[in-house]
Amino acid sequence: MIYGNTKGVKRVTLETLENLITDYDKNAFVDRELLATVAEISGKLNREICVYISRSGRVMAIAMGDAGTVELKEFSLRRGSDRFSGVRVIHTHPNGNGRLSDMDLSALKHLRLDAMAAVGVDRGETTDMEVAFLEGNGFQGFYFKPAEAADDKILKKITELEKDISVGAESTEAVPGTAILVNVTQNGSGKTELSELARLADTAGLPKSFGRVYFIMAS
């Protein structure tokens, strides 16, 4: 699927992009020929182009923007707050600067992408690439120059960081609280007052286990 700002783009160019929507090596962060073709078209049109790639290596969609922006849509193949979307985004910067912008990082976080990559393009050729992953409340980034130097091993970061998120989610799951009710009394009415404390604990939703009840008598 090709979407976005396709106005004025020749049919042959759209067909070339359409033909890129297929399966690639899942162990490659981005196929080199795919990247070269997208960079060439991005440079020729002076428009940002965005490519969505699944973990299986399939290009799911390609979006076209203008010289400075491209619309990002949500493509999520996985569910759960402790999971990433299962989709990574590689997009071009036809100004020749492959550094990720604040807007790029915001989209990475909002869409919970596997990764966000920006590729600098100068006269149809790639210059550099920056890749970012979600890590906790922040990001982990890698910079490559030239762009073709991008190490496919960074794909392992996706599963590693996602595993860290899952472990963190498990450790922060709400655990029912337990109350130890202790009443210090001087007038012998401890049992009545402890019953009142138990009622308050019940109102708060705390689980109770009744066994022996000990009263601490103040002198």
List the predicted regions and their residue ranges:
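N-terminal accessory targeting/assembly segments
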Residues: 1-219
